[in-house]
């Protein structure tokens, strides 16, 4: 069997196959790790449904925390064993009917297991944080059941070795996103946001399904290793043509675009901010990571179409710079960073399209940890002030020092500033792309600058600005919220040391001094820009029409929702109206017309009834003669 491309095997996503009977028990039972999350969901159901009402909903939270902790411990043991034994592959038969053989497989590589640990660890700290954030929430058990469902689906996505199973789990992520965004379903705006998020992601899922079905028909297998072998010789052998490869690639790209909130399917992440903040932590840190990992696994297939790669680069570039610009104009605290998530995932898309999977994974891990910490600090602000409007916040630095420090560490971890994690990611990608792709180097540096400016202007407004009425009596958060923030801040600070220790990508610290200066300079330029922005004038609309147009353009997301309503929504509404008219006028009219014709004919025939048998026989004979004459005429004509 041909080996996958060297660049793909380098990061360990291709696993050697060993007999599971020869493996240690923790490795043999790795398939249990996704089930920990699902079991937490099932254990929470008695409290979530109200079957058990004694002692409140907290036992459901404790049970979820326990099974998630077991998942973290089990994953840690497995990743240690895999580092010693090498990559493994577990496979179990699922369904065998005639020639149909469906298998459930798990690729146990270091990169997959590192992503698994990121998912389970983020779920654990998020659940601890939620105990404080949702302390008075009457439906706490329902929230933990949904988080368990979320965790199980994400764990399965990162371990799955089968594209069909990955698609099935991505659909579960779409469902869980809908349920978590609509958690406070009594609010009309929340219901609308949940519906829009679900429908937007469904568009990507349907296109992905078309790609999955087409790929299955062409390759004959859904196992990633089989797909890599097929893709290695697909064009040369004529198994697929350029047009087919292009359509296949575009379909496979659409699903991760929706999951990672990339242009033009990015609106759902902004609207998903209507959900509880602990759910926003998971969505902005690890849910988007799962979508990018699926795209990463599909890259050996996507490279069959140069046009698909160009589309991926265009989508990533537009999302990176566009998301960073839109984030600068937001006054909602959570939305300012949700657009920044879109921006960072755009950079990951560029790295994947340029076949730099190791750097893409580093970006995902560094972004996931720092973004989770940033959203935790945002949640602390919302919990103590019940406000997320930047124009109504200020002076929290002296009142919430732990939260301010966590926000500062998380925000700095997202910017290319020495010595935090993203600095090394930026330096490595800039050094790698500079000789052949200087245009994309500019995209990375501009995004770094805009991100730094955004986090600094938010920090100034929330923590350094004048004290506002809603922040005058704001206390520091309770220990259940402070503990995960402090723990995650320590991990973010230690991330550069961890990266140097494990050396995930050769040459991670070997880029030259000019590259380091360019990355650090773009970050410092962004910090300086954020410091110099006049806050009072920044929030108000300018009296100059030209500047006001730019402000509105960014604040309203380049009018993307308006464009959607004027084009796609209007087109679908017009098609629905035309279909309704056709159904009522043509289809229903034809059926009703036949019925009316039958009634009129019956009324006419009723008048011709004479009761004389001879006239009936004569009518029958004439009809038969006419029918035979017509048939004879047709036969002669033919």
Where are these regions (language model features)?
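Aromatic-capped, Gly/Pro-kinked transmembrane alpha-helices
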Residues: 505-510, 539-638
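Transmembrane helix-loop-helix hairpins at membrane boundaries of multipass inner-membrane proteins
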Residues: 3-31, 35, 43-145, 220-242, ...
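Hydrophobic alpha-helical membrane-insertion segments
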Residues: 65-80, 204-214, 410-414, 486-497, ...
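Hydrophobic alpha-helical membrane-embedded segments
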Residues: 72-76, 371, 449-455, 522-542
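Alpha-helical transmembrane segments
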Residues: 41-45, 324-326, 454, 458, ...
């Amino acid at each position: 069997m041909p080996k996958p491309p060297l660049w793909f095997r380098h990061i360990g996503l291709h696993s050697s196959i060993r007999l599971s009977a020869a493996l240690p028990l923790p490795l043999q039972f790795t398939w249990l790790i996704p089930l920990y999350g699902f079991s937490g969901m099932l254990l929470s159901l008695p409290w979530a449904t109200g079957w058990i009402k004694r002692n409140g909903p907290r036992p459901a939270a404790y049970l979820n925390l326990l099974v998630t902790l077991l998942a973290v411990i089990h994953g840690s043991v497995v990743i240690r064993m895999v580092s010693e034994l090498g990559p493994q592959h577990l496979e179990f038969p699922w369904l065998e009917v005639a020639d149909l053989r469906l298998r459930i497989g798990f690729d146990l590589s270091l990169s997959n297991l590192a992503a698994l640990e990121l998912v389970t660890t983020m779920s654990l700290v998020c659940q601890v944080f939620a105990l404080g954030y949702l302390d008075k929430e009457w439906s706490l058990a329902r929230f933990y059941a949904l988080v368990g469902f979320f965790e199980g689906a994400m764990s399965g996505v990162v371990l799955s070795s089968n594209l069909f199973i990955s698609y099935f789990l991505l659909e579960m992520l779409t469902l869980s996103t809908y349920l978590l965004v609509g958690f406070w379903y009594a609010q009309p705006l929340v219901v609308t946001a949940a519906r829009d998020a679900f429908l937007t992601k469904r568009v990507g899922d349907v296109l992905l399904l078309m790609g999955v079905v087409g790929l299955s028909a062409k390759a004959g297998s859904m196992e990633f290793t089989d797909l890599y072998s097929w893709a290695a010789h697909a064009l040369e052998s004529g198994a697929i043509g350029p047009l087919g490869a292009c359509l296949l690639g575009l379909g496979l790209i659409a699903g991760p675009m929706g999951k990672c909130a990339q242009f033009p399917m990015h609106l759902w992440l902004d609207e998903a901010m209507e959900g509880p903040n602990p759910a926003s932590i998971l969505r902005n840190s690890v849910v988007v990571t799962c979508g990018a990992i699926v795209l990463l696994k599909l890259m050996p297939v996507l490279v069959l179409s140069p046009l698909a790669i160009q589309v991926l680069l265009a989508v990533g570039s537009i999302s990176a710079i566009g998301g960073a610009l839109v984030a600068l104009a937001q006054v909602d605290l959570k939305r300012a960073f949700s657009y920044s998530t879109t921006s960072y995932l755009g950079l990951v898309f560029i790295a994947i399209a340029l076949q730099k999977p190791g750097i893409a994974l580093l970006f995902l891990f560094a972004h996931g940890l720092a973004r989770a910490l940033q959203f935790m600090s945002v949640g602390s602000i919302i919990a103590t002030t019940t406000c997320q409007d930047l124009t109504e916040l200020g002076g929290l630095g002296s009142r919430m020092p732990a939260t301010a420090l966590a926000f500062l560490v998380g925000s700095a971890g997202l910017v290319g500033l020495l010595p935090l994690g993203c600095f090394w990611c930026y330096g490595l990608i800039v050094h790698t792309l500079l000789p052949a792709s200087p245009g994309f180097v500019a995209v990375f540096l501009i995004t770094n600058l805009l991100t730094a400016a955004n986090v600094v202007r938010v920090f100034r407004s929330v923590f350094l600005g004048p004290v506002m009425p809603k922040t005058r009596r704001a206390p520091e958060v309770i220990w259940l919220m402070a503990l995960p923030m402090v723990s995650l801040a320590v991990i973010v600070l230690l991330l550069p040391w961890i990266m140097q220790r494990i050396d995930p990508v050769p040459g991670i610290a070997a880029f030259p001094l000019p590259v380091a200066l360019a990355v650090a300079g773009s970050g410092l330029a962004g910090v300086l820009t954020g410091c110099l922005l006049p806050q009072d004038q920044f929030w108000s609309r300018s009296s100059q029409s030209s500047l006001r147009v730019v402000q509105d353009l960014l604040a309203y997301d380049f009018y993307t929702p308006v464009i959607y309503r004027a084009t796609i929504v209007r087109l679908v509404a017009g098609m629905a109206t035309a279909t309704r008219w056709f159904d009522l006028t043509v289809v229903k009219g034809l059926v009703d017309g036949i019925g009316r014709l039958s009634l009129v004919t019956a009324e006419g025939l009723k008048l011709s009834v004479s009761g004389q048998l001879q006239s009936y026989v004569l009518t029958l004979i004439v009809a038969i003669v006419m029918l035979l004459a017509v048939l004879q005429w047709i036969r002669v004509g033919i």
